[in-house]
Amino acid sequence: MADLSFIEDAVAFPEKEEDEEEEEEGVEWGYEEGVEWGLVFPDANGEYQSPINLNSREARYDPSLLDVRLSPNYVVCRDCEVTNDGHTIQVILKSKSVLSGGPLPQGQEFELYEVRFHWGRENQRGSEHTVNFKAFPMELHLIHWNSTLFGSIDEAVGKPHGIVIIALFVQIGKEHVGLKAVTEILQDIQYKGKSKTIPCFNPNTLLPDPLLRDYWVYEGSLTIPPCSEGVTWILFRYPLTISQLQIEEFRRLRTHVKGAELVEGCDGILGDNFRPTQPLSDRVIRAAFQ
């Protein structure tokens, strides 16, 4: 799938047959038929899928999460590519930024690969995860891969301790200065397949608290096909803030290439690109705060 970015060439699980791999690679998908992903992407039927609803009362306080401070060693990225892939906006980071500490295996580093956005057509929805069944207008994902154990993100997908995703909820309020570099060029990549290089992007501006102490952790999956498991999720308690004008720039984006003929009943607007929450099953949500 040419539009799936880092998972398009992901290494398949060993037990999959070659024809199954080819079938997954060649199938388009969308959010309107999200419940059917499992028909083509078997991992989407797994027991430990994402996103989930975070019930704050049921989260288990784990003080050991603070024994080793969660440490993002992020650097400013020069000449970052921002792409509309028809499903989301991706910011591909070329500079080597790494994450370690907190709930992550000791001595292992996770390299930041990209930032992805999920948003609603209206402010009442948009985030993939919910907190006590409350949705936010947007959710950002900072996607990392284990560069200690694997040679590439393709190798890390679907493996235990392979992927770590930091999720940040977004609410409407003041303009987010750190995201201006992205929102200001969205009009230039309105259609699927369009990309633009921005001169500078600082992922540190996305972190809500310099102490990084208020977060939840659970084990889950990618939220887009192939929905591979083995993903550690770190969700920050306090949301970022962007302006109404900034989120409206996302809502002008399109799911199709310019000039494409749309199917009946489809307006081509890119929005509501979030997967429904999945059953928690027997998983435990840990909290680094009380």
From Swiss-Prot:
- Single Gene Ontology MF annotation: carbonate dehydratase activity
User: A Pfam family matched by this chain, by name?
Assistant: Carb_anhydrase
Domain (Alpha-carbonic anhydrase) spans: 27-289
A GO BP term here is: positive regulation of calcium-mediated signaling
Q: Which UniProt keywords apply?
A: Metal-binding, Phosphoprotein, Zinc
Q: Which Gene3D superfamilies match?
A: Alpha carbonic anhydrase
One CC-aspect GO term: cytoplasm
| Active site: residue positions | H87 (proton donor/acceptor)
Entries under SUPFAM superfamilies matching the protein:
Carbonic anhydrase
Give the matching PROSITE patterns: ALPHA_CA_1, ALPHA_CA_2
Outline what the protein does: Does not have a carbonic anhydrase catalytic activity.
**Which family does this protein fall into?**
Belongs to the alpha-carbonic anhydrase family.
Name of the protein in its database record:
Carbonic anhydrase-related protein
* Organism per entry: Rattus norvegicus
